[in-house]
Curated annotation (Swiss-Prot):
Biological function: Catalyzes the formation of N(4)-acetylcytidine (ac(4)C) at the wobble position of elongator tRNA(Met), using acetate and ATP as substrates. First activates an acetate ion to form acetyladenylate (Ac-AMP) and then transfers the acetyl group to tRNA to form ac(4)C34.
The species this protein was found in: Bacillus thuringiensis (strain Al Hakam)
InterPro entries xrefs: Rossmann-like_a/b/a_fold, tRNA(Met)_cyd_acetate_ligase
EC code(s) of this entry: 6.3.4.-
Protein name (record): tRNA(Met) cytidine acetate ligase
Membrane-crossing segments per the record: none
Length: 393
């Protein structure tokens, strides 16, 4: 955050944040409201939600939704972390793919026919069409997402400028800590769910306010969220489904339904199920997203109705600093998308999916807490934060 502000000289900072389930196909550690508090305490001025229909998706759709929201908010500049660290290289790579689109698409198909996952096939295709040192390594996860951000900016004819910050020391999927006080999201999650886990183990890798709010969530609600807590619900659902039922679920393609129904029979945990399910053709993340759609019963028809090929249909405001509130007041007439401060009375196909995802997310809670949290989510107004006193209002 500090590097972003230093690099962009921004007047205000806006974060587009996933809701209950994340792009890599797993539940968020804590609710979006606690994560909103974390973001505000760390210097973000406006926090808005990326709807489930965009957030639990491949990088292209994820980026398209996020950029459409930022564009609607009249953001002048975006900043993202990447393994490459040179923004010119992202523009060069997008340009190279466009110029070699026919060859690129043919190569992707060729590599997929050889049994590779889409992500692997794409990475291999880029290696064949990109020879210059000024192109990015498309096998790296943050480079892939950054590439899609730039592509979305150009496709949406946005005037938005882009900056990138090089990720040092720790890669996104690294599972262990290093001694440079930089840790990946994966390693932090792994530590939090390990035996004898302690928040003190991660305190040097995350902001103090974040550590405090993580501890507070676990104390108040008795848990942090991970896939294993949903496994019994997930397995029960699959045990009651036929292959035909599964084929209606979003991202269940190419006979994957048969493999899923076969492997769930002998799996006693989500991790063991994933180990049995994974193949060369499907990445772990791709399979986790498919499992998330099964858990939330998100169908192909629902995603079609959400019209994800277009921009996000609304802006759900989760939190704001005083500076952020001033920005919205000054610019609200220019913002064409509806800004939702709650979802109780608004109706849209995208929001129908969102409500289901929230219901599933809180399903691991005991009653009456589960019902209370679900009701609160629909009526919850944006969290307000006074940055001068560092207090929530």
């Amino acid at each position: 955050m500090q590097q972003t502000k230093k690099l962009t000289h921004s007047d205000i900072t806006i974060a587009v944040m996933s809701g209950p389930f994340l792009q890599r196909g797993e539940p968020a550690l804590v609710s979006k409201w606690y994560r909103t508090k974390m973001a505000l305490a760390c210097g973000v001025d406006l926090v808005v939600e990326l709807p489930y229909a965009f957030s639990t998706q491949k990088a292209e759709t994820f980026a398209n939704g996020a950029i459409s929201i930022l564009n609607a908010l009249h953001v002048s500049e975006i900043c993202f972390g990447s393994e490459d660290g040179q923004i010119e290289n992202f523009y060069n790579t997008v340009s190279a793919q466009k110029n070699e689109e026919e060859t690129f698409n043919r190569l992707v198909k060729q590599f997929m026919n050889a049994g590779n996952s889409y992500a692997k096939a794409t990475s291999e295709a880029f290696l064949h069409i990109l020879s210059s040192e000024k192109n990015i390594d498309m096998s790296q996860p943050n480079n892939i997402l950054g590439f899609q951000y730039i592509k979305a900016i150009l496709m949406q004819n946005s005037s938005m400028q882009a900056q990138t910050i090089k990720r040092f020391a720790s890669h996104y999927h690294d599972e262990t800590f290093n001694d440079q006080h930089i840790a990946s999201a994966t390693s932090i999650r792994k530590q939090l769910f390990s035996e004898n886990s302690s928040f003190t183990e991660i305190e040097s890798f995350i902001p103090k306010a974040t550590a405090s709010l993580l501890a507070s969530y676990k104390q108040n609600y008795g848990t942090l969220h991970n896939w294993e807590q949903y496994f019994s619900f997930f397995k029960y659902k699959l045990m009651t489904m036929s292959p035909e039922d599964l084929r209606h679920i979003y991202e269940i393609e190419e006979g994957l339904e048969h493999r899923i129904l076969s492997k769930i029979q002998t799996s006693s945990s989500f991790h063991l199920f994933m180990e049995a399910l994974k193949t060369k053709r499907y990445t772990w993340t791709r399979l986790q997203r498919a499992c998330t759609h099964i858990l939330t019963n998100t169908t192909k028809e629902e995603i079609h109705c959400a019209n994800i090929e277009q921009h996000a249909p609304y802006i759900r405001l989760l939190g704001m600093s005083q500076k952020g509130q001033t920005y919205l007041s000054k610019n609200k007439k220019k913002i064409e998308l509806p800004i939702l401060t709650h979802t109780k009375t608004f109706d849209h196909p995208t929001l129908h999916i969102e409500r289901k995802a929230n219901s599933v997310y809180f399903s691991i809670m005991k009653e009456p807490l589960r019902t209370q949290l679900l009701k609160r989510d629909a009526t919850h107004h944006p969290i307000r934060y006074d940055e001068t006193t560092a207090k929530f209002l």
